[in-house]
Amino acid sequence: DNYMDASGAAEVLSKGPQTDPTGLIRVRGIKLYMDGALGSRGAALLEPYSDAEGLGLQLTPRDQGLALMKKAKAVGAQVAMHAIGDRGNRMTLDWFEEALAGDTKARWRIEHAQIVTDTDLPRFAKLGVIASMQPSHAIGDLYFAPARLGKERLHEGYRWKDFLDAGVVVDARHADFLAD
């Protein structure tokens, strides 16, 4: 299954999920980007980074993201949102909640879901949102995550067991080839 990024979303959002004539390629939805990576300090955090000033980046404006999500919902397309930081994950959950309007069967996903607060973690199950988490990121981030988050927030990262215990569907396949 494939997802179109925002630049190629128009066709998916006008026609809905599609399969090519050979049946080999399926486009099920769109992929958006809420924030950047933790290593570069681009992940959107609720509190400043522990090792530098700043809260990270918000890459998709709210009005644009919500409009695309509502169109996706209307045509039955899935949405995958890249969100790494706790602020990025919270905003994504807020937008999903608004766009889905109570539909818990849409199978929308948050790609990475690396840093999630105790308050937001159960919202994944409540909203039917899949946490698509890549184990290789925990290994790759091992050397800088403690410095970026500080010891007080480190427990909010890489929460596979917490997600499973909360009844969240976790997908552990690799979303891309950024971490080898």
Predicted features and spans:
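Metal-coordinating catalytic core of metallo-dependent amide/deamination hydrolases
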Residues: D1-D86, R90, R123-I130, P135-S136
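His/Asp/Glu-enriched, well-ordered alpha-helical/loop segment
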Residues: M69-W108, H112-A113, D118-P122, I130-D180
